[in-house]
UniProtKB/Swiss-Prot annotation:
Example GO BP: translation
Organism: Campylobacter jejuni subsp. jejuni serotype O:2 (strain ATCC 700819 / NCTC 11168)
A single MF term (Gene Ontology): structural constituent of ribosome
Domain of life assignment: Bacteria
Similarity comment: family membership: Belongs to the bacterial ribosomal protein bS18 family.
HAMAP family hit by this protein: Ribosomal_bS18
Protein name: Small ribosomal subunit protein bS18
Gene3D superfamilies reported in the protein's UniProt record: Ribosomal protein S18 (4.10.640.10)
Subunit record text: Part of the 30S ribosomal subunit. Forms a tight heterodimer with protein bS6.
This protein's UniProt keywords: Ribonucleoprotein, Ribosomal protein, RNA-binding, rRNA-binding
Annotated function: Binds as a heterodimer with protein bS6 to the central domain of the 16S rRNA, where it helps stabilize the platform of the 30S subunit.
GO cellular component: cytosolic small ribosomal subunit
Amino acid sequence: MAEKRKYSRKYCKYTEAKVEFIDYKDTAMLKHALSERFKIMPRRLTGTSKKYQEMVEVAIKRARHVALIPYIVDRKEVINNPFEGL
């Protein structure tokens, strides 16, 4: 019988840092919730609590609307680091 993998417990980094508000202009903080193709990563992968996940989603959508974060990334750009310019 195969052994079960032991995973480390995921924690919400925003709760631990006692963040009250997530600003859409802070792209350095928002990039941790984005995949390499700038898609919003789900809670089960990031470990973010429901309250902060909703705040992150709203902030990312606002940043996209103001053109601080792109909506999509070309395949060619994924080979390079898309977060290099942030």
